[in-house]
Amino acid sequence: MSGKKKIAYPIELPFTIQEPILLNNAIDKYQLHKELIDQLLNALKGSFHVGYVRRQKKYIHGISANSLNEARREKLKGIPGIEGETNVVFGTFLPPVKGKGEFDFSIYNKETNFYKLWDYCYGENAIRDGDLIVDKYIKDNKLRQKWDKFCVKQKNDEHKMDMNSAHNTFNILGEIQFGNWAMVYKDMFRLVSAINKNAQIDLYIYIAATDNLKKIISDGVVGVNAARERFQENIDNHNINKPVMIVPLDIDFDLDTYDFSEAEKGYDEISREIQELEQKISWNKKKITVLNDKKKNADSEKAKIIKEEIKDLRNEKKHNQQELDELKNLYKISDEIEEI
């Protein structure tokens, strides 16, 4: 859900994480795969470029939730073996064919993943038209090359046997959620759906905001405490039977003493430039409308003069619009999350 449009002025802020919340035997997974999980957790710490926004609230300083989400995703890309947007298709993990994925990131055993898709499309009890399934869901060129190379080795076993995949795999699905509080229900639904598709999910990681971080994003975003309560409810009623780690993302500075003066100055300057350009464009439109009306009743000589004036105004309007679009793109106009 979105509210008033805001510009997001780029600044760098320090972030950290609080102690992760481990649900449904997630502690066992953490102890077994501590090195990998710590690598992921450590990637969430440090200074990140985010978008500063001004808000009409008690605490006027804020940051764009979208910019924070993008910064986290970009940092996670540096972890070996991690995948970005991920869908669960017939129990396998695949990148979305188009648009956003069901999950923000994943780490999974690539060979075992191919085994599962092979069994579904070409195994002993495979679905009919397995080739069509593959063509529909494996669109990424690099992934298709790996799949085709894998299939060459298995071609003689089509519809004769299922593949014996490794049992010592460790698969992670994860979500970074700084959206409206109601998104936690959608996220849980996606997890339950993936479980029902027989995906091998060894750990689900959910990154949400602490109360401190919510103060500079919005009180309406998914918070750690609410996420913990909702996930625990669904674990208790057996909708979710996978280990869940909730990671509290926090700011690493004192809100009451942090100096935002440079960010405020830059934000005000850009806001003023955008407002001035919008006013010029609005004035151009009104002036063009007035001149068009005048031209209708003018004699031919006067009409030519008016036509040239309109042409100049349109060129000026076009130039101003281009400049405005460039500014908005550079400073990433973002949606501010509405308070609930």
What are these regions (language model features)?
Residues 1-97, 268, 272-340:
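Nuclease-adjacent, charged terminal/linker segments that flank catalytic cores
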Residues 40, 68, 72, 76, ...:
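Generic structural hydrophobic/aromatic packing signal, biased to beta-strands
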Residues 58-60, 75-168, 180-189, 196:
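Active-site metal-binding core of divalent-cation-utilizing nuclease and nuclease-like domains
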Residues 64, 101, 223-224:
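A diffuse structural propensity rather than consistent per-protein peaks
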Residues 108-141, 255-291:
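Internal, charge-rich low-complexity segments
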Residues 156-245:
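Conserved binding-pocket/active-site segment within a compact domain
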Residues 210-286, 319, 330-340:
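Domain-level recognition of nuclease-like catalytic cores that cleave nucleotide substrates
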